[in-house]
């Protein structure tokens, strides 16, 4: 009878330990919510000059229509045309 009680106490203790560690991990993940003003250092910073260059010289087609007039330079090097602007994708 004592061994059964001891096994039950140990099982409850292990369950409590696992539950506590899982709750702490979940709480830590909730604390790391990204706010709109936060910047993510893992994301590459966008070069302002490259954006302006691509805005004025984008010639990638979107839905069959060019973003910028023909004869202009195309956005290259991973830049794509979105909403009539060249963006780094």
Swiss-Prot record:
Disulfide bonds join 54-75, 58-81, 67-86. Residues 24-50 form a propeptide. It comes from the Eukaryota. It is found in: Secreted. One of its GO terms (cellular component) is extracellular region. Expressed by the venom gland. GO terms for molecular function: calcium channel regulator activity; toxin activity. Keywords: Calcium channel impairing toxin, Disulfide bond, Ion channel impairing toxin, Neurotoxin, Secreted, Signal, Toxin, Voltage-gated calcium channel impairing toxin. Residues 1-23 form the signal peptide. Belongs to the neurotoxin 12 (Hwtx-2) family. 06 (TXP1) subfamily. Inhibits voltage-gated calcium channels (Cav) in rat cerebellar granule cells. Has insecticidal activity. This is Omega-theraphotoxin-Ba1c. It comes from Brachypelma albiceps (Mexican golden redrump tarantula).
